[in-house]
Amino acid sequence: AVMQVASRRTEIRTLAGRKCRFPMRELMGYSKTMKPSIHVDKLEERWRDILETPEEERPNNWKDLNPAKYQVAFVYKSLNRLIQASAADQTKKAMKDCMDNGHWPMLTVHDELCFSIEDDGQVAAIKELMENCIPELRIPSRVDVGLGTSWGSAK
């Protein structure tokens, strides 16, 4: 369903409603014979032309140009974009909720937040805020906590 929405609208919406675009339904080339970026509509048009051409006059790489071959890449790209962007939305919301409650992260790396902790009560409070930052999720979020004297030694 995500692929059809992305293909039809050239965009998808993240968990927080943020718009992620798919410019002109472009796909990266996955063979040596293709240019770095190809517009799907042009690929489909070229495929129709190839099928109308007698087989002996078709280019050597004509089977590589089948648009169905690239549908898997488009599905992967649209799902990956949705998952990664929604995870970023969730991390931003968790950061905001933590800051609103007086817990300021010192460092963020992708989906990890590093806090300076003074007592165990802060750990439980931060963990609960992060796990419940988007309560409408059907699958609950789980937060792994690592403690240490430095970020590298946290376990």
Describe the role of every protein-language-model region.
Residues 1-155:
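Conserved catalytic core of nucleotide polymerization and phosphodiester-bond processing enzymes
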